[in-house]
A protein has these predicted regions:
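N-terminal capping/linker segments that flank leucine-rich repeat
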Residues: 1-117, 123, 129-133, 153, ...
């Protein structure tokens, strides 16, 4: 519960909840994400994460699946702190590492989190070396690589993510030609068209 969080983490959680668009709230029943059935995480582990300034909370009511947001920790969250997430590998489904200090070495450890469906890595220093590890996250549906050093070299690995339906490549080193080559790997043409439009901006 949010009331169990420390003051700073509570503020972050309330900010997230307060800024959910009303339209999304009204459609929440229709748009309930499909979540895996997993055992509950240890309250002690969740407390340790909160004390480290990492927001960790259930994705929805009546589920043990967890959303972790480390972006509030910013540059204070590095590769070593990814190890703090290991005790919740069975529950971690959504992970936000945007604007943190994680590197390719840290991304290598994410292969332990096979249930991940959403992963934010925008504005981190990761490079093409990370893509081979990302390709092993077979349940990924959403991947944000905005503002990273990812290039066309990563595309063969990203193409292996068969469940991926949203991929953000703004301000990366991926070329328009590289983005174009992704077309046949994405069934949803609207997502593909959005990707190409983003690359042209």
């Amino acid at each position: 519960q949010i009331s169990d969080l420390d003051d700073n983490t509570q503020k972050s959680a309330f900010h997230v909840l307060a800024n959910i668009p009303k339209r999304l709230i009204s459609q929440s029943i229709i748009l309930q994400p499909k979540l895996p059935i997993v055992p509950p995480a240890s309250p002690k582990v969740l407390k340790n994460l909160r004390e480290a300034g990492i927001l960790a909370m259930p994705i929805a009511q009546n589920t043990n699946a967890i959303y972790v947001n480390a972006s509030y920790a910013g540059q204070n969250f590095d590769d070593k702190k990814i190890m703090l997430l290991e005790p919740i590998a069975e529950q971690l489904v959504w992970l936000n590492l945007a604007r943190t200090k994680v590197t390719d070495n840290g991304i290598a450890s994410l292969t332990k989190y096979g249930l991940l469906t959403r992963l934010h890595l925008e504005n981190t220093v990761i490079t093409d070396k990370s893509s081979i590890h990302l390709s092993k996250l077979s349940n990924l549906e959403y991947l944000n690589l905005y503002g990273t050093r990812i290039s066309d070299e990563s595309l063969p690995n990203l193409q292996k993510l068969g469940k991926l339906n949203k991929l953000f490549l703004w301000q990366t080193k991926v070329t328009p030609q590289g983005a174009e080559s992704l077309k046949k790997y994405f069934v949803d043409s609207q997502i593909y068209n959005a990707l190409i439009a983003q690359k042209k901006d």
